[in-house]
Amino acid sequence: RQMCIRDRVKEVRKEKRPEGWKRFVIPDVCPVCGAKTERERDTADIKCTSPNCPAQLERHIINFVGRDAMDIKGFGTVYIEELVRMGYIKNVADIFSLKEHREELIAQGIIGKEKNTDKLLEAIEKAKQNDAYKLLTGLGIPNVGKAAAKAIMKHFKTMERLSEASEEELTAVGDIGKVSADCIRSYFSDEKNQVVLQRLAQAGVNMTAEESETVD
């Protein structure tokens, strides 16, 4: 039988602090882009408020191409950082336009030589056929992880139908509460997000749930 040992702080020994120590101050501006920061609701997380912050975009793209989302093999963090820095990726839809810049990417060696570049572009093309829940997971909507995305797409079938769903319809889906429903409705009501979704659809990214799609 294992014992649980709880550590307790009995006292603070200020004299033990190293010389020149400084109290940690939660930043009120983003260290990357300089925009104001704010605390996320119901969490201790601090986030940048700028939609154009490179660090936020990189994090968003990393989530989008990750295993639980679009699962684009070989799309490493180093490539993402460089593609964002060079202006090739400004939102997730730009990922599916990279093939239009194939020659430039090879010439600049951003992804590597011809073989590596083509391999990644092929993986991106293949990802277009993913189950729709993977796309929903990758959009980065707060409180909508992989399991929730599966349940949502199984219920609504298409991204278009989901975008029109009311709060009542959303909360009728198992494990989807008011907070999650509000986040989903907020995402789909944003004009910038609507443009990104239109571009994804035009690029041929699957927006429909598979008939056999089930919740694990």
List PLM regions with ranges.
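Short, small-residue-biased leader/transition segments that mark boundaries at the very start
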Residues: 1-5
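Accessory alpha-helical DNA-binding modules that contact the DNA backbone or grooves
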Residues: 10-215
